[in-house]
Amino acid sequence: MSKNTISLSIYDGSEGMEYIVHKNGDVNITTIHNGGIESEVDVDVECFGFETPEGLIADLIDQGFEIQWPV
């Protein structure tokens, strides 16, 4: 993952979601169902009502998403 992106995820067993938020405002969303990828979509932070990536990131953290730090 590049230094211009941040990954946030939330999982409950084999269900969950991952958001990869890019500095330029692009967002990749992956939905996990029964341990496998169910859907993937690419959108912009403005689709969520935010003008900047930081606003979306703060909202996701408030919802319980966790930042996935590089290993």
Model-derived regions, located:
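Acidic, low-complexity, intrinsically disordered interaction modules
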Residues: 11-61, 70-71
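A short beta-strand micro-motif
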Residues: 4-12
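Short intrinsically disordered terminal tails
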Residues: 1-4, 66-71
